[in-house]
Amino acid sequence: MKIVENIDSLKKELNISREKNLKVGFVPTMGALHAGHISLIKKAKQTCDVVVVSIFVNPAQFGPKEDLDQYPRNIETDAKFCEDAGVDIVFVPQEQEIYPITDDTLHISYPKYTTRLCGSFRPGHFDGVLLVMTKLLNIVDPDVCF
């Protein structure tokens, strides 16, 4: 299992797989892995040749008074879960890698759905989820996402 921390390294690894026509599966997470994540990883292993798991606590889906700093982070434990489950690549980017400091700001909103469920009392939560998922899917460019 390889642990990569930046987009360029991830793309190099994935290009090797794509040159061999291997099917890439992607399991995006915020870490704190549990049995639900492991079941997704196992399904990805059954379906795909290469499995990528991202571990990124997305600040864009936390409101200003929410507990971003308290969200559990234990890369060592999560990496062990991934290794035991047969993950090929763990992508662990820093915030600057996903949200570089630039003058360009991307915003994605889908009000029909982003105001439902916890979005009704957590303004911007699902906008943040949409944004990070768009970015991660464009970075990993998987054949299948779980």
Locations of the language-model features?
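Nucleotidyltransferase catalytic core that binds NTPs
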Residues: 2-146
